[in-house]
Amino acid sequence: MAVKKRTTLRDKHAKSNTKSNLSGKIAELKEENNGQESDYHENPFLKLSKVTKKDKQLNKSQNFSQKFDSSTLNTSSNISKSALRRRKRNARNELKPKMDELLQNLPETTNVIDPSAAAHKPNDHKSTKFIKSTKASANLPNATKQTGHAKIMTQESKNFTNVLKNPQFRSSPFSALKDAIAQNIQNQ
């Protein structure tokens, strides 16, 4: 099994240039010959097409290569691949925002130092306190899934038994519920 040779755009472009030169000369010769022939034919429906299939294909490929060459940057064989890459990289870098322009456009600010923070010494370990996070636990069970629903039910049954065992609830159930609801609201 033979390995197919890969062709690059450069190779295709070079081949099309040589083909276009040959096809241009062939087309000129055909035009000269056609000019000498008479246009009269007995049956015009039997008259053969003057443009062959190969010529149509060549014209189509030439038109495409011309459009392709005009749309791209200079991809002629005179420019190296590294130079093309460098030009593209520089064009991309020009589109990126520059930090100098950003710093010029930002308003200037003065450093405001809080007097209470300035009094705090960084080496003072005795005054540091544990700060409890206010973020809610992200590991709560999902009530829409079966396992999460089961976990919630076990937690609620434990809470229910704890509430029933609570002496405050036994003495006045409504005041205990009111306190529990207020406590839940504060926790949230």
Swiss-Prot record:
Transmembrane segments: none annotated. The lineage of its organism: Eukaryota, Fungi, Dikarya, Ascomycota, Saccharomycotina. This is Ribosome biogenesis protein SLX9. It comes from Debaryomyces hansenii (strain ATCC 36239 / CBS 767 / BCRC 21394 / JCM 1990 / NBRC 0083 / IGC 2968). Coiled coil: none annotated. It comes from the Eukaryota. InterPro entries: Slx9-like. Residues 59-81 have a biased composition (Polar residues). It is found in: Nucleus, Nucleolus. One of its GO terms (biological process) is maturation of SSU-rRNA from tricistronic rRNA transcript (SSU-rRNA, 5.8S rRNA, LSU-rRNA). Interacts with the 35S, 23S and 20S pre-rRNAs and with the U3 snoRNA. Keywords: Nucleus, Ribosome biogenesis, rRNA processing. The keyword Nucleus applies. Residues 1-89 are annotated as: Disordered. The gene is SLX9. Residues 1-16 have a biased composition (Basic residues). Belongs to the SLX9 family. Involved in ribosome biogenesis. Required for normal pre-rRNA processing in internal transcribed spacer 1 (ITS1). May be involved in the movements of the replication forks. The keyword Phosphoprotein does not apply. Pfam families: SLX9. Residues 27-44 have a biased composition (Basic and acidic residues). One of its GO terms (cellular component) is preribosome, small subunit precursor.
